[in-house]
Amino acid sequence: KKETLELMETLDLEEPIDRDVYNVGFGLIHQQYDMGEQVGKVLGHGGNTTCHHSMFNYIPELDVGIVVMTNSQSAIGFYATAGMTVLVEYLKEKGIVVEESKAECEHIKCDSNDMVGKYATGLGMMEIKRNNKSELVTKVSKIPIRLCPCKDGYYQCTPVKVIHKIPIFKSSIQGMRLKPATYLGEDIMLFEQSGKYHKTKGVIGCKYERTDIPDSFRAACGNYTIADEMFKDIKCKCQLKVEGEVLVLEIAALNVKLNSCLKVVGEDLAILQGFGRLAREMVKLQKKDDGYYLTFSGIVFKKI
C-alpha cells in the first residue's frame, strides 16, 4: 500500500546511528549509498540465502528504482555491483547528472585518541594504534595503512608501503574512510567507501571484547569441511584458530570471506563479535566419536 511505503520512507528512530550514514528504518536501509545532491536520498534493501541473492534500491524523489535477483551460488558479490551499475547507467541515460565521487579530503591536525583500540570487524581484528611518529596506523585485510583525520570527523586511509602507492591500489585505499561513533551505548566503527559514482556507507564493526578461550575450543582449532550433504558441492574453506589469544573463525565461500572474532559464552558455544546482520551469530561446537563438528549459520562443518 502507498501508506505503508510512505511509512517505510520515513526514518523515525529514537537514536539514529549517524544522520549522514545509513540507518535501518521500517524495512528499508537509508543512505547506504550517497550519489550526490542531484540524485537525492537512496533507499533500498537486500538479502540472501545460500543459493539466492537479491537487492533493490530506489530514489523516491525521482521515482526510479532497480531490482536485481540471482539464484547463483557464486553471485553474492555480483548482484550489488550490477544493481548499482544499472542504476547509474539509467540515471545517466535520463539526463540526470551523476558526478564521479571524489576521495580527496582536506586533512587536519588532530591529537585525539578516540580511534585507538581493537575493533572486531568482518575482516578480522583491526587494531588502531600510534606509531613512533605519533601517527594513527592499522591494517585492513592485512594491508598496513595510515589514518589521516579529516574536517568532518572521518579518518582517511592512506597507503604506507611503496607498492600500495601504485595508482590502482592507492585510489582503492584512499577511497576508504573510518569514523568512531556510539550507538545505544556501544562503541562502533563507521566506514565510507568511495566508488566511481557513489559512496557506500555503513558500519564495519565494534570495539573488541576480550574473552577467555577454554580448552574445548583450543582443542577444536583446525581446518573444517562442510559435512551437510545438501551443501557438499559448495567450495568452502573453514578454519577455527587462535591468533594472539583472539579466537577467530575464518570462512571463505561463495566469493565472500568472513574473518570474525568470537566471544566464548560456554564450553561449546561462542558468538561472533561485530555489528550488524552477522553479529552475535552462534558458533556451536560438538565433539563426537569421529571428531569435532562446528555449526555456523545453519551449516554443519567437520574437522579435517
Regions found by a protein language model. Give the residues of each.
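Catalytic loop of the DD-peptidase/beta-lactamase superfamily, centered on the K-T-G motif
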Residues: 1-232, 241-243, 250-257, 263-304
